[in-house]
């Protein structure tokens, strides 16, 4: 019966050590304050164009539309016609 409390104490010690390791890892993680995060978001939104807000950035030029898929469709059709294989790997 003398071993049972020792085993329980050993299990408790192991759990505490695991918790300490988790807390050390969390403490070592790089942190950013809320004000710095907000400044980073403001900087990103002011330097990257978002055409979903045309009041701010205007409308994109026809050739500069990043959401236009006609170029991709034309290239796919050409590459499909040139090969005799049944599949195209991209």
UniProtKB/Swiss-Prot annotation:
InterPro entries: G-protein_gamma-like_dom, GGL_sf, Ste18_fungal. The modification Cysteine methyl ester is found at residue 87. The keyword Disulfide bond does not apply. It is found in: Membrane. It holds the Pfam family G-gamma. GO terms for molecular function: G-protein beta-subunit binding. GO terms for cellular component: heterotrimeric G-protein complex. A lipid is attached at residue 87 (S-farnesyl cysteine). This is Guanine nucleotide-binding protein subunit gamma. It comes from Kluyveromyces lactis (strain ATCC 8585 / CBS 2359 / DSM 70799 / NBRC 1267 / NRRL Y-1140 / WM37).
């Amino acid at each position: 019966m003398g071993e049972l409390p020792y085993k329980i104490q050993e299990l408790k010690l192991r759990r505490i050590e695991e918790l300490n390791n988790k807390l050390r890892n969390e403490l070592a993680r790089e942190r950013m304050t809320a004000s710095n995060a907000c400044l980073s978001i403001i900087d990103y939104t002011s330097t990257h164009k978002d055409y979903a807000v045309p009041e701010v950035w205007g409308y994109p030029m026809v050739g500069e539309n990043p959401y236009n898929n006609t170029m991709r469709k034309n290239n796919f059709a050409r590459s499909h016609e040139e090969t005799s294989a049944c599949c195209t790997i991209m």
